[in-house]
Amino acid sequence: MRQYQPNRRAVLQQGLLLGVGGWAAALTGCSSPDNAPAAPTPTTTATPTPKRGGATTANRILLAYFSRPGENYYYGGRRNLEVGNTEVLARMIAELIDCNVHRIEPTDPYPASYDATVARNVREQNADARPPIADPLASIEQYGTVLLGSPIWNVRSPMIMTTFTESYDFTGMTVHPFVTYAVSGLGSTERDYTASCPGARIAPGLAVQGEEVTQHRADVETWLRDAGLLTT
């Protein structure tokens, strides 16, 4: 399946586990430049002001994302973020299209420490865990399109994203993945969503390097236009 990524950066698609590359892949949506916007955490579910006119049930859009602030990977080092990179990207998308926004929050929050989060993620992946979600949505049946956002941790989306996708019936919907990463691009995200969202069409995803997320608004707009979600 085709994925959309900015042309100016080649993405390593290898399954690196440890060492500098592997630890980067383990927590890839975890870096941001100095000018990354800092803002209060949004409420669990928010509805941005409509920008494209009224929507019927068939074309209503849900943007659901998981993002982790705190100590994050940054060009081989570490950096503390008030706002996680995936949230920065999700806000950028929500400014451009008419959608309802839902932040996926774990019942047991991930540690602020980068290394502790890496270790927890490895345990969850090895156990094929389904971390519980705090305040989950009651239903998504009113939507025809779902944008799913997350970092890439150890070459795939965090296991909490599988908790989310397995909780709902995506039959007949279109799913648009978007991720922030360090070295692994989309990783196995499209394949994983194909497995956990049976009956849905998995559209080409968007992968943005976490350290440079604020620099890619034009790429976000192109991706949304190619997906038919942005027409102006």
What would you call each of these model-derived segments?
Residues 113-198:
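Helix-loop-strand module that forms the ligand-binding subsite of alpha/beta enzymes
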Residues 2-19:
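N-terminal secretory signal peptides and thylakoid transit peptides that target proteins
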Residues 68-71, 106-110, 152-156, 181-186, ...:
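Solvent-exposed loop/turn segments at secondary-structure junctions
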Residues 205-232:
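Glycine-rich phosphate/pyrophosphate-binding loop and the adjoining helix
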Residues 31-143, 155, 225-231:
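N-terminal beta1-alpha1-beta2 submodule of the flavodoxin-like/Rossmannoid cofactor-binding fold
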Residues 83, 87, 91, 158, ...:
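Short, surface-exposed alpha-helical segments at coil->helix boundaries
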Residues 63, 103, 148-149, 176-178, ...:
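Structural recognition of the beta-strand scaffold that forms the well-ordered cores
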